[in-house]
């Protein structure tokens, strides 16, 4: 019991189960960034990406980072620190995703620079852009205990038109009474799959 309780408490902290902050709704990857739906972008279309490259993140990415931060603060006020599994909290740190995806993209596109939107990409002289979207299906403590991560990368040409979409997917089924959810491993696997497709389709 002494091992199980901290794990369950930390899991609630990380995933906002029960009465924690509600999960942010998943929105279209282009919402408030581009005046069309992302649904029509061809999947796996080969292209040569112009340099230098802009990196833009979707509302889903920003919502994910904000949600984990808010959940951590919320449960930190309720759960005694002695019952908190700090390893799980570290495993779900949203800055890990940001660092890993940026590191991977920089290997392929050294000129990559973060911008807030396409207007800034054009005004700063970027000749191509990558928009990163993140979709997460969180485990259900009493249902499907599988965490699923999808990372979508949309590639835009010099005119800032979307030309190709690539996806990296990974999932992990969390065992009952687990002391960790292996979220960073799941992110790493999704990024690795995405990188393999970048190698195959993007020049």
What are these regions (language model features)?
Residues 1, 113-127, 192-203:
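Extended alpha-helical regions
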Residues 1-18:
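Sec-dependent bacterial lipoprotein signal peptides
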Residues 18-45, 107-109, 159-203:
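C-terminal/domain-edge helix-coil "capping" segments
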Residues 18-99, 201-203:
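A structural "domain/chain start" motif
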Residues 28-31, 111-163, 174:
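Surface-exposed short loop/turn segments
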Residues 48-59, 129-133, 150-154, 165, ...:
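Soluble periplasmic/extracytoplasmic beta-strand elements of cell-envelope proteins
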Residues 97-115:
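A structural motif corresponding to the C-terminal end of an alpha-helix
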């Amino acid at each position: 019991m002494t091992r199980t309780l901290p794990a369950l408490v930390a899991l609630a902290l990380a995933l906002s189960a029960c009465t924690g902050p509600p999960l942010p709704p998943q929105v279209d990857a282009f919402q408030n960034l581009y005046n069309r739906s992302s649904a029509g972008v061809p999947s796996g279309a080969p292209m040569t990406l112009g340099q230098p490259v802009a990196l833009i993140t979707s509302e889903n990415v920003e919502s994910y980072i904000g949600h984990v931060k808010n959940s951590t603060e919320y449960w930190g006020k309720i759960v005694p620190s002695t019952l908190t599994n700090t390893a799980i909290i570290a495993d779900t740190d949203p800055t890990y995703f940001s660092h890993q995806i940026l590191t991977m993209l920089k290997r392929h596109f050294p000129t990559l620079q973060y911008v807030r939107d396409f207007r800034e990409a054009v005004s700063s002289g970027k000749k191509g852009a990558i928009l990163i979207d993140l979709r997460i299906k969180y485990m259900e403590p009493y249902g499907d205990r599988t965490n699923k991560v999808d990372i979508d990368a949309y590639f835009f040409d010099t005119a800032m038109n979307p030309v190709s979409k690539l996806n990296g997917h990974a999932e992990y089924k969390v065992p009952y009474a687990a002391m960790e959810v292996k979220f960073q491993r799941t992110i790493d696997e999704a990024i690795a799959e995405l990188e393999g497709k970048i190698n195959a389709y993007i020049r």
